[in-house]
Amino acid sequence: MSCSIFKDLPEDHPRRLIPALCRQFYHLGWVTGTGGGMSIKLNNEIYIAPSGVQKERMQPEDLFVQDIDGKDLQMPPEIRELKKSQCTPLFMLAYRHRNAGAVIHTHSQHAVMATLLWPGKTFRCTHLEMIKGVYDDADKRYLQYDEQLVVPIIENTPHERDLADSMYAGHDGASRLQCRSGQTPRSECSDYLFSIAVEMKMAGLDPETFVDASKA
């Protein structure tokens, strides 16, 4: 870590946690190059990663801080010439309408492949163990192994801000798949499920259907 004025903050403070997670996500292949984004809400402060920065090199002082109304509270040093994440309008939707505590935008290859292999506007899978790690916000509970996970797929746009209406429209789940881009997820369980479901599709299996081998 650099000699930052924020070095004495606890490790779980957003100024330290966001750079640490972005480095982890970079090594997982979720935020390669300058792609992807992340934000964490702490009390009345919303911490937002900058745009156009290599995620594995991000520092605590690089973050933007604003309130729920969009008023800037703290900015990165001017010499860094940083811009706030283009995902900011989408982050704010989650905070204002879903009472989210954090939002992550990944460019997972598994999520991208899922948008290409699933026709229509939804990704679906069932009877996969990690479904139990996905929280159903509508029912306020975790899904069961034998239930169906449904994730909307929305069309990509040239600019992130133009996705706001599609992100907001008509779904109570925690994630969205952005066609040919990635996901705004409960990340690890979702990424695992996309990976397994894509492999099942490519092997000629149907992730949306359960086949009881004992009755075959």
Swiss-Prot record:
It catalyses: 5-(methylsulfanyl)-D-ribulose 1-phosphate = 5-methylsulfanyl-2,3-dioxopentyl phosphate + H2O. Its main location: cytoplasm. It holds the Pfam family Aldolase_II. Zn(2+) binds at H105, H107. It is found in: Cytoplasm. The active site is at E129. GO terms for biological process: L-methionine salvage from methylthioadenosine. Disulfide bonds: none annotated. Pathway: Amino-acid biosynthesis; L-methionine biosynthesis via salvage pathway; L-methionine from S-methyl-5-thio-alpha-D-ribose 1-phosphate: step 2/6. Keywords: Amino-acid biosynthesis, Cytoplasm, Lyase, Metal-binding, Methionine biosynthesis, Zinc. GO terms for molecular function: methylthioribulose 1-phosphate dehydratase activity; zinc ion binding. The keyword Translocase does not apply. GO terms for cellular component: cytoplasm. Substrate binds at C87. Gene3D superfamilies: Class II aldolase/adducin N-terminal domain. Its EC number is 4.2.1.109. Its cofactor is Zn(2+). InterPro entries: Aldolase_II/adducin_N (IPR001303), Aldolase_II/adducin_N_sf (IPR036409), MethylthioRu-1-P_deHdtase_MtnB (IPR017714), Salvage_MtnB_euk (IPR027514). Binds 1 zinc ion per subunit. NCBIfam families: salvage_mtnB. Belongs to the aldolase class II family. MtnB subfamily. Catalyzes the dehydration of methylthioribulose-1-phosphate (MTRu-1-P) into 2,3-diketo-5-methylthiopentyl-1-phosphate (DK-MTP-1-P). This is Probable methylthioribulose-1-phosphate dehydratase. The lineage of its organism: Eukaryota, Metazoa, Ecdysozoa, Arthropoda, Hexapoda.
